[in-house]
Every structure is written in structure tokens, then in C-alpha cells.
Amino acid sequence: MVELMISAPASGSGKTVLACALLAALKDRGLDPCAFKCGPDYIDPMFHRSALGVDSHNLDLFLAGEDRVRGLYRRYGGGRGSIVAEGAMGFYDGLGGTTDRASAWHTAHTLDLPGLMAGRPKGASLTLAAQIRGLTAFRTPS
């Protein structure tokens, strides 16, 4: 069973494309995927549902809190063959852009999900290693 959080260093990095591709592959393999989106975003879950025919639900730590988000995750993801959660903005970008509260990192930490980073490597090489190291070392666990 696949359970993971797809995130990125910033918006526009390919999270939704990667999430949709992974959900389509899981569905094609008969793994009954369920999708989640961090925060109140309604557009990406619409892609998950309309384009792929995959159930998609929001996980909003700001509006629902940790206990309710855990309950929603179990309610909609329990018994599914695979779960793909998609972050919003950058991995650590939470409320107001000044905290990691309600971020993809906070959601992944709350649900004990491993992360998969999307990114645009154009025009960079060794700098990518520094960015990856920074993303993995900024908070514990990461």
C-alpha cells in the first residue's frame, strides 16, 4: 500500500501533475487510490475527482485541527489500496507564510506520512543538493 505526501519547495513545482500521474498509475493497477489536499483548496481535488475519477478530500489543520484531520484521513482513506496527499505552496509554508502551522510538513507529521518532493531542476545542479539537504534538515522529523 502506498501512503505519502507530495510536496515541493514552492508553488508551481509540479505537485499536482505528479499527484495526478501517481493517482492514475495506482488506479490503473487496481490499487483503489484516495487523494487528499492540504488546506481549503478546492481546485486540485476537482482535478483528482473529475479528471481521474478518484475520491479527493481536504485536510485543513487550521479549520479542523489535528484530531479531526486524523479522523478524516482514517474515515476516507481507511481500507483504500493507496493514499496520495498533496501539499500546498512550499513544504513548510503554513499560515500567513510565517509559520509551519497547517503546512504540508505539519500535515505529514500529524499523519505520519513520508514525503515525496516535486521540483523544477532547470538551470541548477549542485544547488539542488543544498536545497534538498535544507528541506530535510529544517524540521525534525522531516
Residue positions per predicted region:
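ATP-dependent carboxylate-amine ligase catalytic core
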Residues: V2-S13, V17-L111, G115-P141
